[in-house]
Amino acid sequence: MDYSEILKNARECSGPYCKACPVCNGMACRTQVPGPGGKGTAATMLRNYQKWQEVCINMDTICENAPIDTTFTMFGRTFAAPIFAGTLGAMKRHYGDKYDDLTYNDILVSSCAQAGIAAFTGDGTNPAVMEGALHAIAASGGAGIPTVKPWNMETVFAKLDAVRQADPMAVAMDIDAAGLPFLKGLTPPAGSKTVEELRQIIDYAKKPFIIKGIMTVRGAQKALEAGASAIVVSNHGGRVQDQCPSTAEVLPAIADAVGGKLTILVDGGLRNGTDIFKALALGADGVLIGRPFVTMVYGGGAQGPGVLVKKLQAELADTMAMCGAHSLAEIRRDMLFGY
């Protein structure tokens, strides 16, 4: 099954909201919530994709003709490429009835592990969502990162107790999920966290801890102060706040401020291996890609994620070769035009 065939299959089964577009740029689903759309006018979601397209590559092939190495190491694990499947949930609500969260996570986590990368998994008000994700991660030898919503402290600690039993490579919290419209007013409540509260959560987790939803230098510094091992520069795919800058726009300043002090991941509108190269050149250590992995699972089942990973890795390696970078460590900001 090839990439085009998977896209075709996904269009037939991904429900009324996601169109499984050839390029997942947000134009067809824009403000569609339920569905994969953005909050408000969807300006943030659309800007994420658009700004990566405005970054241009400086080619330079006067260099050694050597093999390209895309391998990436984080928290003691080595991956085929600096790519993670991003956090998504409420699959039936947003993407169609073919998969519930438990089945989706089973397929995603195991398929990503087989493809040489790892998946972030989601959380929800139904305890079975986290339980199912943790079961999938444990079955894959810990090759996955459960993402806990910013619930009240009692609920967060209970979730972390469950996480510990699965022994994942790390644990994450999407701190910006407090802005999701469909989490408003639910029980347990979700909301923002102080540095001290995050410090308590991180101490309790006893695992490398990733704070997702960082969009400012000050936010990155607070995550570092709280003891985070990594951050994800993210605006939740444009789903939590309208009229925000893109992740491509804020990444360089954040990387300049905290790069080397913690691991920096980024998501939001990255759609091919060239985009991944741009993110690494701007200071990220790795990337998360969300919505396209949904399309791959819906259209290709267990085969889908591996097809996407292979495509992204090949595109990344090709861009590296055309810029004279033979390893991720050799990717520099001046390989981008105007930087």
Positions of the model-derived regions?
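Long, hydrophobic, well-ordered secondary-structure blocks that form the structural core
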Residues: 118, 128-155
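Short beta-alpha connecting loops at secondary-structure transitions
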Residues: 294-305
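An N-cap/entry alpha-helix motif that binds or orients negatively charged groups
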Residues: 2-80, 331
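N-terminal pre-core extensions flanking Radical SAM catalytic domains
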Residues: 311-329
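N-terminal functional module of multi-domain proteins
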Residues: 44-130
